[in-house]
Regions:
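Mature extracytoplasmic domains of secretory-pathway proteins
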Residues: 54-89, 94-101
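C-terminal motif of bacterial Sec signal peptides marking the signal peptidase cleavage site
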Residues: 10-13
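Bacterial signal peptide processing site
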Residues: 15-17
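Helix-rich interaction surfaces within compact, conserved domain-sized segments
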Residues: 84-133
Length: 133
């Protein structure tokens, strides 16, 4: 009962936000969302938060100064030897216009991380989206 009332209240709040802040058709455009998954450990142990932040400032920000989002996550993966590993992770989410140039910049970020932190892999997921501002 309480959950239903809360759901109705949230739904009403969202509806009122839509009415107050309508998106014009021109505010939306097709874009490409790229999510880059970074494990925060290497063969020596955890990668320090300061090292991660330095990487973001040195590698990610110059390539996408208009903005991106960093999500704190926990990941699980299987290495080449079949062992299951669990580690703290970061996901960098970038939404861009879908040009080959922007995708190349994302690939550069992944390659730099693999090189700098001796990683077997960095996962990149590309999804077509409609972005509205």
């Amino acid at each position: 009962m309480c959950g239903g009332a809360l759901s109705a209240l949230l739904l009403a709040a969202c509806a009122s936000l839509d009415a107050r802040y309508p998106l014009a058709e021109g505010d939306c455009a097709p874009r490409l969302q790229e999510r880059v998954y970074f494990g925060l450990s290497d063969d020596k142990g955890p990668i320090a938060e300061t090292a991660w932040q330095a990487f973001v400032e040195r590698v990610v920000t110059p390539r996408f100064p208009a903005g991106f989002t960093v999500i704190v996550a926990g990941g699980q993966w299987r290495d080449r030897d079949g062992h299951i590993g669990k580690e703290t992770s970061r996901i960098v989410e970038i939404v861009h216009d879908g040009t080959a140039e922007h995708s190349r910049l994302v690939a550069e970020i992944a390659a730099a991380y693999k090189r700098d932190f001796r990683q077997e892999a960095v996962l990149v997921v590309r999804t077509p989206v409609t972005a509205c501002f």
